[in-house]
């Protein structure tokens, strides 16, 4: 188990009926969240640069929310939020596990940024949504070649 679990972009914008990801992914994400103490779970929400800050972002329906540790990002990597970086450093985090969406987008960018920040990084594929499976093979190769611990299989 890593020091912190980062749940990336599990929000109604991306995970809902008719979207690329649905209830099966939410169930897998919830199962992973349940294995961590609530004070070790961090949620990342994406707010595009053009979106108004006063518009509340919503988690996907049914997501297990066990912590009030919620950080917004406006770019692909969650490490573009200095408050998240300060929180992790201030709490002595050495290792981070990532789950969420999309394996070729924000999860990929955040994982690679965490490696550059010298964290031990792991990803549980059973709780990662990937819209483009073919392209994801390149992502997996990049992760493994940078020392990311990859476990599980895409659901």
Regions found by a protein language model. Give the residues of each.
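Active-site neighborhoods of divalent-metal-dependent phosphate/nucleic-acid chemistry enzymes
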Residues: 91-95, 99-105
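Short beta->alpha junction loops
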Residues: 71-77, 128-129
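Active-site acidic carboxylates
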Residues: 1-72, 85-86, 90-94, 148-149
């Amino acid at each position: 188990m890593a020091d912190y679990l980062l749940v990336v972009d599990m929000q109604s914008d991306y995970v809902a009926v008719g979207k690329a990801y649905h209830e099966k992914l939410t169930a897998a994400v919830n199962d992973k969240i349940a294995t961590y103490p609530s004070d070790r779970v961090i949620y990342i929400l994406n707010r595009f640069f053009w979106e108004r800050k006063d518009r509340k972002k919503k988690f996907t329906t049914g997501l297990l929310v066990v912590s009030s540790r919620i950080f917004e990002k406006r770019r692909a990597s969650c490490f573009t939020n200095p408050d998240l970086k300060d929180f992790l450093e201030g709490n002595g985090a050495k290792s981070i596990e990532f789950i969420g969406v999309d394996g070729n987008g924000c999860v990929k960018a955040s994982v690679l940024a965490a490696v550059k920040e010298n964290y031990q990084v792991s990803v549980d594929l059973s709780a990662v949504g990937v819209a483009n499976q073919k392209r994801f093979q390149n992502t997996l190769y990049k992760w493994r070649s940078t020392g990311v611990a990859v476990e599980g299989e895409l659901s």
